[in-house]
């Protein structure tokens, strides 16, 4: 069983519109990197966000922020969090576990852009929507974190390798 499999299966069952980003996406694209959290970029419709929040709560996840998690489904509240609280992601965690899910609410790559060239990667018998290398690099460029700088270098190497394989 892959980490987060229960959530990912439920997302699939409920037809949640999302794309995997962050460290797990880096792993799925071909780099070895230690990470325990899963970042997702989701379609920001109220209905889709309500599905995500409901699934995470049912699976035992809690919010780190001292706010009602259903607020993420309200566009006015989301905008307040982004502009007044400088929030970029909404974090859910599972007690006594390293598992965390970050719903990205502010990104240089929109869900629509990510979905346009999403990669579908099959792991076992589940197909995962994963952000493209180019879009993931765009997301990681302005974070200022050293891990993201390393990820960008790895992603560029993977892209170059894949382009080289396409020449054959």
Language-model segment annotations:
Residues 1-168:
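Compositionally biased terminal segments of proteins
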């Amino acid at each position: 069983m892959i980490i987060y499999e229960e959530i990912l299966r439920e997302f699939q069952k409920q037809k949640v519109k999302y794309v995997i980003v962050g460290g797990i996406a880096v792993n799925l694209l071909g780099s070895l990197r230690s990470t325990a959290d899963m970042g997702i970029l989701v379609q920001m419709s109220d209905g889709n966000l309500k599905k995500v929040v409901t699934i995470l709560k049912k699976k035992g996840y809690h919010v780190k922020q001292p706010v009602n998690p259903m607020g993420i489904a309200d566009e006015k509240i989301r905008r307040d969090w982004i502009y007044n609280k400088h929030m970029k992601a909404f974090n859910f965690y599972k007690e006594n576990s390293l598992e965390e899910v970050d719903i990205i609410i502010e990104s240089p790559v929109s869900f629509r852009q990510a979905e346009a060239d999403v990669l579908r990667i099959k792991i076992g018998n589940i197909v995962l929507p994963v952000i493209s290398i180019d879009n993931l690099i765009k997301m990681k460029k302005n974070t200022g974190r050293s891990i993201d700088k390393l990820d960008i270098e790895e992603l560029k190497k993977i892209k170059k390798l894949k382009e080289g394989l396409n020449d054959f």
